[in-house]
């Protein structure tokens, strides 16, 4: 498989596949990177259908692990905007694949973009609920978060006051892109009710894997993911 590694405005990027007029932007999830297993599978399936794939590292991930820029929503949305602007200059038809929090950043960054199709794996569609769940689990009040600004949780995730404020001030209220969602019934991060509400509100096709988790990583889960891609990449 042809792979070209380069940087777009200092964002480490991989372009997968031979030259084409069609491309998927691939946005990875938390604790992942631009060469994650699901992105490799996406590239394999998309290339078969005549697409290229552009994947990149979010702040604090992959080649950017040691960067000073934190993986905060405002920086990630900015990076996604840089990527889509580059892509629109070089390709005629743009589609989107996003996983977990990568889907959330995409919902914010790409709501006004001309994207033909979106494929979401285990998408985060309500970040405010996830942050508030974490605050509840670890007995962190909004007042304490505001005072301390940054709090490290026992599960290794940092909570930021400015991140929380951004999320509250920028709700997901627009999404008109033709979207397919693959969700695991055993997802411990995103409740089914929230995903289902989003899917119905924005007319997305939702497929649920009974033995799927938030992180698709077993052979069975990745096989289902691959079959789902084969069905929905036209």
Predicted regions and their residues:
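Catalytic nucleophile-loop/oxyanion-hole region of alpha/beta-hydrolase
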Residues: 61-90
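Conserved alpha/beta-hydrolase
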Residues: 38-39, 43-65
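N-terminal cap/lid segment of alpha/beta-hydrolase-fold proteins
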Residues: 1-19
